[in-house]
Amino acid sequence: MSLPSCVPGYRRILLKLSGEVLMGEQQFGIDTDYVARVAQEVKDARDSGLEICLVIGGGNIFRGMAGAAKGMDRAQADYMGMLATVMNALAMQSALEQLGVPTRVQSAIEMDKVCEPVIRRRAERHLEKGRIVIFAAGVGAPYFTTDSGAALRAAEMKCDALLKGTSVDGVYNADPKKDPAAKRYETVDYDTVLADNLKVMDASAVALCRDNNIPIVVFSIRERGNLARVLAGEGTQTTVKKEA
């Protein structure tokens, strides 16, 4: 689905994808066909003139909190989860470059053989040259989620919005899978999200976006063409922002 030549209001965005999205219909791992489809949508967005940062979770491979719940040391489990995000970043880089999109991976845990370290000024230069920058390994420290990493990078890179592509089409007042009466918000303010513990991102990520006035747009990336619709201000989504 093509995008308008100029997306209103956005010059630079950060797109956060949950790791589970990369599984496609599988139960584990990376579905390369599905990654290629998402990569095409990201390419279309970039071709519209947007500067794009990406952050991808690692839940399709390993989730630190799940490992800790099974008796692993929490810090060790979190580092394993960070490495999973690097694997996902490399998979997305490969898919994007097969489409002719120049892409760089920057990791908060240095691994010179496979990617660059996170260097803000270098990342800005990549974006200015039309490259996509994928940030991996969260914030580089345990006890922080990839959502917090996404919020940090969005603030650091002065992004106009943080788009969160998940398996759910927005933010609800209850779990729509358990409560058929759950209602989806069109817009909701940061403080309501925090006070009501709405499942958008973890509290530190929401607070960081609030403090830097970065809107959070939650939508389902599983529906083909949805990224284009959201960027055009259409489609089903929830926007988290300051109270009007």
Curated annotation (Swiss-Prot):
What do we know about how this protein assembles, alone or with others? Homohexamer.
Q: NCBIfam families given for it?
A: pyrH_bact (TIGR02075)
What is this protein called in UniProt?
Answer: Uridylate kinase
Q: Which CDD domains match?
A: AAK_UMPK-PyrH-Ec (cd04254)
- Record's function text: Catalyzes the reversible phosphorylation of UMP to UDP.
User: Which Gene Ontology terms of cellular component type are present?
Assistant: cytoplasm
Sites where the protein binds ATP: 16-19, 59, 63, 166, 172, 175
Q: Name one GO molecular function term.
A: ATP binding
- How would you classify this enzyme at the top EC level? transferase
EC number(s) of the enzyme? Answer: 2.7.4.22
Subcellular location as annotated = Cytoplasm
Q: Which residues does the annotation say bind UMP? A: 58, 78, 139-146
Q: Which GO terms describe its biological process?
A: 'de novo' CTP biosynthetic process; UDP biosynthetic process
Give the chief site where it resides. Answer: cytoplasm
Q: Does the keyword Hydrolase apply?
A: no
